[in-house]
């Protein structure tokens, strides 16, 4: 495990103007971001050995040319001298995927069984190609091996993980490699680490072809120069500043598709050693009042390809956390909101900003172009206050009565004002020109009559809903007001009345359901003051002497006739004519002629 390296920061030095830059002056003018102390030879050797060991630790091999009926046990017997961690045999393709203990066993198995024969078939043994190798660049030079492992380990199981060090100084070159067991883990790591800030730097992550990566290609020949002066576009001056030791073969400033400068440049040298020397001399160099930061790019691609990759990576890092669609402007947000919400949003800084010192969602009022004039501000303020003073709509939305003019509203409310307890008012006064409420007569007797019949206390009277066409009397034939039908209050009233009617009609079938004006079917009452509907007898007795049945014998509501003629007339027409009542003389004669055998049988001798 690599040891921790202390970091010292040197303050930036002011550049000398109007003089030629000499070698000694250039060294004094350098202000690198991190000045690392020199390492002892033993520490350098340990770091280089760890990097080489991890680089060669490819323990997965691929065996081709196996017979079609080969079994898993035969592959185990073939590699019996090695320690197998995983083995999968594909009989259809004649291949086997094997994971050994380490890279040394994999190299030994390749040397032993490559181009050997199994059942007269030649085998091909090689390292498995991998597509889960990442190169993480632009790391801080002081980052240790342990810290790098902690950075990349949360995304999945690691196969290899190592930093690349300088062979001369043993210091980190600012990039490392991480190979995962699965490709989806590597893809997740690339997505999360790309553009992630780590200290003063922003990480760049690239896919790497493990087959083309050799020990010599671990060291990069390209340098990335950032922290250029604002608006710097002199490529020749940059090349001269970085050509003090070796001249680059490629030097270009980064520009976007719109021609805007990106603030960094990429240089490529002939060898990795030249690039390392140029980096050590140019890191922290003053140019145009800014101290350059020179770091190594990911190894492998040439300078031109690396420049395009860094431009794309920078764009991805800048768009990190943003959606696919562009951010809407203020006018689009206000158009999507309603007038009340827009006014409240605009005037929130004016109403609450002065008291608490807080700004609204859109910032301070002076920054809003819609509130420039004082007259407009005053008008918007008055309109906002009026909007806040308005009554909020209910659950069912705005009431239809709100759209009526004051003169068109009814004199009395539909249900009256509910008391604090939540109950209904005991009685509503009738309106002028309207019939009296019919709901109590439909629900049965009220007041003392209900208590006498055992029906419980009287229910609260309500204004009835409009009666159907077939049940309307002469007093309800006029058209109803438009606010009696269709409003949320009328829906509530009709539903409540229907429930009360259903519950009370089952108890009050013996009482008159009719009012004093006329019958339920439009018939006038009889001569005795009762409706024809009450002439039906129950059990041979009059309905006027009927008592409430016991609770265990519920009564059902009798079906109403469908014609205006009372149904008792048809029934009485079918009854036979009764005999005349006998006179008292006839009764006495009949009594005298009746034998009295019971008198003789009841007497006993004395």
Curated annotation (Swiss-Prot):
Pfam families in the record: RRM_1
Record's subcellular location: Nucleus; Cytoplasm
Motif (Nuclear localization signal) on chain: 45-60
CDD domains linked to this entry: RRM1_RAVER1, RRM2_RAVER1, RRM3_RAVER1
GO cellular component, one term: cytoplasm
Compositionally biased spans, kind Low complexity: 453-462, 592-606
Keyword Transport carried by entry: no
Signal sequence annotation: none
Coiled-coil annotated spans: none
Span list, region Disordered: 1-41, 391-474, 519-564, 579-606
The keyword Nucleus belongs to this UniProt entry's keyword annotation: yes
Modified residues (Phosphothreonine): 463
UniProt-listed Gene3D superfamilies: 3.30.70.330
In-chain residues carrying the UniProt-annotated modification N-acetylalanine: 2
Chief site of localization: nucleus
Function text: Cooperates with PTBP1 to modulate regulated alternative splicing events. Promotes exon skipping. Cooperates with PTBP1 to modulate switching between mutually exclusive exons during maturation of the TPM1 pre-mRNA.
UniProt subunit comment: Interacts with PTBP1, RAVER2, VCL and ACTN1. Part of a complex containing RAVER1, VCL and ACTN1.
Protein name: Ribonucleoprotein PTB-binding 1
Source lineage: Eukaryota, Metazoa, Chordata, Craniata, Vertebrata
